[in-house]
């Protein structure tokens, strides 16, 4: 029969062994730093035109990327960047805005090349308004040409950033803007200065020719959006189409600035961010 002291020693050694085993299986001690939610990127870049550049959203009428729906860092806009940063602080300081006021689809391949150089993990694309708006109806970019520019740009992204996520955003509904503002004195005055003439010239006219012109521009924007969706589908599973969310925004004149009654103000940029932000980064 073992002595009492032997029993005590064995019990103590067993307890120590169990404690050591438990410590070996324990996870690392908390560091105090929040863990990023799965899939949230640590860098991003925005491609496009004046809408994404935040043009007209500041007190002076210039590009204002800090208010951009995509990469904006200002408190006034709950941009994609700020939402991602809340979930993944590693993205802080790693958001570039390459959008240029006046850019058309023809400029997208060059922007895509710069995006590749940045090595961004998340890319947003909103392009096409200027292809419809930059001149008269006959000057609109042909649909086939538009698609060719998309394919070239997306090809560069797919080759240069094969693991990055791409979000393609639909062109907002410019015809709805005309519907909202054609009887607003401030909008009419602004549009007569040459804002998107293909759609907004002679804004108060009900002549058949003007109505037909507006219909043709609306149809062309629909065709561009169709090609954006198709190009994204052809890109593969690393591209997501917004499903027409931006085009479907039921906006009001309160969402555009009071200088040109065309570009989104801070509230409009927020609305774009709300409509297009991916709930999950699972693609």
Residue ranges and their predicted role:
Residues 110-266, 274-281:
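Alpha-helical cap/lid subdomain in secreted, periplasmic
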Residues 16-19:
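C-terminal motif of bacterial Sec signal peptides marking the signal peptidase cleavage site
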Residues 41-45, 51-64, 73-74, 105-107, ...:
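Extracytoplasmic/periplasmic mature domains of Sec-exported, cell-envelope-associated bacterial proteins
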Residues 1-13, 220:
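N-terminal export and membrane-targeting signals
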């Amino acid at each position: 029969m073992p002595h009492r002291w032997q029993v005590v020693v064995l019990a103590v050694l067993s307890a120590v062994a169990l404690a050591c085993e438990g410590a070996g299986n324990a996870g690392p001690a908390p560091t105090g730093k929040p863990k990023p939610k799965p899939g949230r990127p640590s860098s991003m870049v925005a491609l496009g035109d004046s809408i994404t550049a935040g043009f007209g959203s500041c007190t002076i009428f210039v590009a204002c990327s800090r208010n951009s729906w995509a990469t904006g860092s200002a408190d006034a806009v709950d941009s994609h960047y700020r939402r991602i940063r809340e979930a993944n602080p590693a993205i802080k300081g790693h958001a570039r805005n390459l959008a240029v006021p006046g850019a058309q689809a023809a400029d997208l391949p060059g922007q895509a090349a710069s995006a590749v150089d940045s090595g961004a993990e998340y890319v947003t694309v909103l392009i096409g308004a200027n292809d419809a708006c930059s001149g008269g109806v006959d000057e609109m970019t042909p649909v086939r040409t538009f698609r060719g520019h998309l394919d070239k740009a997306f090809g560069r992204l797919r080759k240069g950033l094969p693991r990055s996520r791409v979000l393609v955003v639909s062109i907002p509904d410019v015809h709805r803007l005309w519907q909202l503002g054609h009887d607003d004195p401030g909008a009419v005055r602004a549009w007569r200065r040459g804002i998107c003439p293909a759609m907004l010239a002679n804004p108060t006219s009900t002549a058949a020719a003007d109505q037909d012109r507006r219909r043709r521009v609306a149809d062309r924007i629909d065709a561009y959006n169709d090609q954006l969706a198709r190009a994204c589908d052809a890109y593969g599973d690393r591209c997501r189409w917004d499903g027409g969310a931006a085009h479907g925004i039921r906006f009001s004149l309160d969402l555009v600035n009071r200088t040109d009654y065309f570009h989104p103000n801070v509230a409009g940029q927020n609305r774009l961010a709300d409509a297009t932000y991916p709930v999950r980064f699972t693609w």
